[in-house]
Amino acid sequence: MAMKLAVNDVKNLSGPEKAAIVLLALGEDHTRIWEALDDEEIKEVSQAMAGLGTVSASVVEDLLVEFVSGMSSTGAIMGSYEQTQRLLASFMPQDKVDALMEEIRGPAGRTMWDKLGNVNEAVLANYLKNEYPQTVAVVLSKVKSDHAARVLACLPEDFALECVTRMLRMEPVQREILDKIEMTLRTEFMSNLARTSKRDSHEMMAEIFNNFDRQTEARFIAALEERNREAAERIRALMFVFEDLSKLDPGGIQTLLRGTPKEQLALALKGASDKLRDLFFSNMSERAAKIMREDMDSMGPVRLKDVDAAQVGMVQVAKDLAAKGEIMLAGSGADDELIY
């Protein structure tokens, strides 16, 4: 086997190699990124990853800062057939690009309903509310039932009921009408989807930063501040970190305590501020607080990496509870503070 050379210059890296380094740097917890790739992309990135060899720390840092800075400064983007073709050609063989683009360009509506199934329900509802109820009925009859239900829930009630009525009376739709609806969706909705999406790049980067350990987070925030201070400040304001749990009300703290494994809680509180630690203890029974303190004392010295992982885990539990409506989170910005 040939000896793998060390990677010391970002300029010499291909697209798949850059993706491989970013994924390695983010670690094994970011499986959702892999799930978004198709089989061919996974194969290319995996091959690049296996052949990387040693990557210097400076290259990793430069590449991640380049990635973060690019995502933060780009803002809204507009995709097109030509832009996609140019992007793919920068890292894929031309014959693969041609085959893939031919598939994308194929018969109108070939994958349109599947694509709509992956569009956020609020975004899709925001578009459909301006269409005729009959058109909406056709669209919702073609997507999966669970997604159709979420879209209907986002529509104005009277309009949604009218759409439901049309769906109940619907007869088989002529192919010509379906083709026209699909073409309209492709040209008026899908092509502008990036501009209608409510989630911006700063929110995405804040989520990524939330999953860094504190040393990595501090390093990249500092590096980003040197390149783009405004972007760094926006990301910091959008981040929800462990210390922000101090803004939970007593009911929220108690709900979080019930949803957090005891071992994880002890490890997370081991590295918490006195204020936050006391807040959690005050929402436990006297006996439970005493046992928790004893468990923490018996741990002895613990690794910062393990504390960070436990705290990130608790933040994720809090976010999951908030998504279910069981607690309310306030971010790090002043506008999110609660008045009682």
Swiss-Prot record:
InterPro entries: Flg_Motor_Flig (IPR000090), Flg_Motor_Flig_C (IPR023087), FliG_a-hlx (IPR011002), FliG_M (IPR032779), FliG_N (IPR028263). This is Flagellar motor switch protein FliG. One of its GO terms (cellular component) is bacterial-type flagellum basal body. GO terms for molecular function: cytoskeletal motor activity. NCBIfam families: fliG. Its main location: membrane. Keywords: Bacterial flagellum, Cell inner membrane, Cell membrane, Chemotaxis, Flagellar rotation, Membrane. GO terms for biological process: bacterial-type flagellum-dependent cell motility; chemotaxis. FliG is one of three proteins (FliG, FliN, FliM) that forms the rotor-mounted switch complex (C ring), located at the base of the basal body. This complex interacts with the CheY and CheZ chemotaxis proteins, in addition to contacting components of the motor that determine the direction of flagellar rotation. It is a peripheral membrane protein. PANTHER family: FLAGELLAR MOTOR SWITCH PROTEIN FLIG (PTHR30534:SF0). It comes from the Bacteria. It is found in: Cell inner membrane; Bacterial flagellum basal body. Belongs to the FliG family.
